[in-house]
Amino acid sequence: MAEKQKHDGRVKIGHYVLGDTLGVGTFGKVKIGEHQLTGHKVAVKILNRQKIRSLDVVGKIKREIQNLKLFRHPHIIKLYQVISTPTDFFMVMEYVSGGELFDYICKHGRVEEMEARRLFQQILSAVDYCHRHMVVHRDLKPENVLLDAHMNAKIADFGLSNIMSDGEFLRTSCGSPNYAAPEVISGRLYAGPEVDIWSCGVILYALLCGTLPFDDEHVPTLFKKIRGGVFYIPEYLNRSVATLLMHMLQVDPLKRATIKDIREHEWFKQDLPSYLFPEDPSYDANVIDDEAVKEVCEKFECTESEVMNSLYSGDPQDQLAVAYHLIIDNRRIMNQASEFYLASSPPSGSFMDDSAMHIPPGLKPHPERMPPLIADSPKARCPLDALNTTKPKSLAVKKAKWHLGIRSQSKPYDIMAEVYRAMKQLDFEWKVVNAYHLRVRRKNPVTGNYVKMSLQLYLVDNRSYLLDFKSIDDEVVEQRSGSSTPQRSCSAAGLHRPRSSFDSTTAESHSLSGSLTGSLTGSTLSSVSPRLGSHTMDFFEMCASLITTLAR
């Protein structure tokens, strides 16, 4: 059972650092989270155990978790894992930034026919996927259709769904009245799939018209309208789509359109992407993405066979499987869902590519590479001038002081993840100043005194970074930090065997043996003079132990 921790003043649960609240539901909040190792954003639904019990919705929550764990579809919100604490459940799900389709329609009104068709095709593909996996959603509505940054639809909230069995009829009346089928509000028996078709028809109408086909503030009157099945069709609607709507909103479920009928309709087939209805129904489980597997191996410093075993084990809580699905989904999102999840290999470039990353917040250029502050000309500001050893040094630059550090051409996120892993292994304690600046201490087992140092990652040039080690004297006033208390090494819990950020790929930048000698370079940092005697030796021993651990 996981425990809540503090990270830079924010709550950390498992691998995820929680951020702002995205919304508040009946059972708790939904917050944005960030996977500490991969950097991917997720949505974390927080379910309070006591509230779940008091509202008697344990079964509803269990169904939602059970269903989402099974699903891997580009237009269904994915559940990556569930983390339990004594007080709460944390459902870690796919994050989308576009909000609800309901809010989009309220703000923009009816959608252009071509765009409405594109969204409806995505929604129906997701519903078809549910039905093929014997799951009926039963509460489809624009509020449960989310939009990502590229205006792709994602179905969410499977709490009301039932898994279908042959010959089984559902008697439960649930869902929102405006979108509910006549047989649902009448309490009649229904098989399941046909109620989702009705709801899809209401959603399509809302997309095309900007209003609902059945609406009334007086609920009995609303029910009468739904049972009568009479709704207004605007003149501007294409005749072809009007016939489709009438077929989907048939009161008699036996006469209502099926998914097969909709897929064969001429209006629906226009510009239909092939990935939405793949011919091979086994696409969602049997094809493993080799590039994603390799990326997991690099990040967690594990073998491909370990990743494959995790994927085939079927354990959704396995950290390697969770990281694999995060990588896959985010690559697909960046590709605007143009290829189906697991149907083929996504592009090899990472969404965290250096060219798109520029300088992350909190990461500073190394002072050695910063321009002198005596002129305002572009030439004086150019970092390349600082690299030119043939040029006379500006008088404004102080005499350089030696420092100890490690250079790397890995991504800054990977470097810091490796540092956290090493500190955890060494049982160091630390306080986060920002994402790339830590204050670290270690207790001398003999004297009982604490040795302190500062670790800061600097941008040396557009290709490499420098992890700087600096001694901290006890007399120095601590900088203000986002964390109120120093973090124990457990704050990096779950960073299981990340890839070494200092693997040898170039002679100067990645060799640790070369780093110790090559990184004794000039720095304009105003370092604190360490205390004489044992403190200096303790500091260097602390540096040596960290460097040795990073080299493993």
From Swiss-Prot:
Residues 511-521 have a biased composition (Low complexity). Keywords: ATP-binding, Autophagy, Biological rhythms, Cholesterol biosynthesis, Cholesterol metabolism, Chromatin regulator, Cytoplasm, Fatty acid biosynthesis, Fatty acid metabolism, Kinase, Lipid biosynthesis, Lipid metabolism, Magnesium, Metal-binding, Nucleotide-binding, Nucleus, Phosphoprotein, Serine/threonine-protein kinase, Steroid biosynthesis, Steroid metabolism, Sterol biosynthesis, Sterol metabolism, Transcription, Transcription regulation, Transferase, Ubl conjugation, Wnt signaling pathway. This is 5'-AMP-activated protein kinase catalytic subunit alpha-2. Residues 291-376 are annotated as: AIS. PROSITE patterns: PROTEIN_KINASE_ATP (PS00107), PROTEIN_KINASE_DOM (PS50011), PROTEIN_KINASE_ST (PS00108). SMART domains: S_TKc (SM00220). The lineage of its organism: Eukaryota, Metazoa, Chordata, Craniata, Vertebrata. Its EC number is 2.7.11.1, 2.7.11.31. The AIS (autoinhibitory sequence) region shows some sequence similarity with the ubiquitin-associated domains and represses kinase activity. The active site is at residue 139. Residues 16-268 form the Protein kinase domain. GO terms for cellular component: cytoplasm; nucleus. The keyword Nucleotide-binding applies. Coiled coil: none annotated. InterPro entries: AMPK_C, AMPKA2_C, KA1/Ssp2_C, Kinase-like_dom_sf, PRKAA1/2_AID, PRKAA2, Prot_kinase_dom, Protein_kinase_ATP_BS. ATP binds at residues 22-30, 45. Ubiquitinated. Catalytic subunit of AMP-activated protein kinase (AMPK), an energy sensor protein kinase that plays a key role in regulating cellular energy metabolism. In response to reduction of intracellular ATP levels, AMPK activates energy-producing pathways and inhibits energy-consuming processes: inhibits protein, carbohydrate and lipid biosynthesis, as well as cell growth and proliferation. AMPK acts via direct phosphorylation of metabolic enzymes, and by longer-term effects via phosphorylation of transcription regulators. Residues 477-521 are annotated as: Disordered. AMPK is a heterotrimer of an alpha catalytic subunit (PRKAA1 or PRKAA2), a beta (PRKAB1 or PRKAB2) and a gamma non-catalytic subunits (PRKAG1, PRKAG2 or PRKAG3). Interacts with FNIP1 and FNIP2. Interacts with DUSP29. Interacts with ARF6. The phosphorylated form at Thr-172 mediated by CamKK2 interacts with ACSS2. The keyword Nucleotide-binding applies.
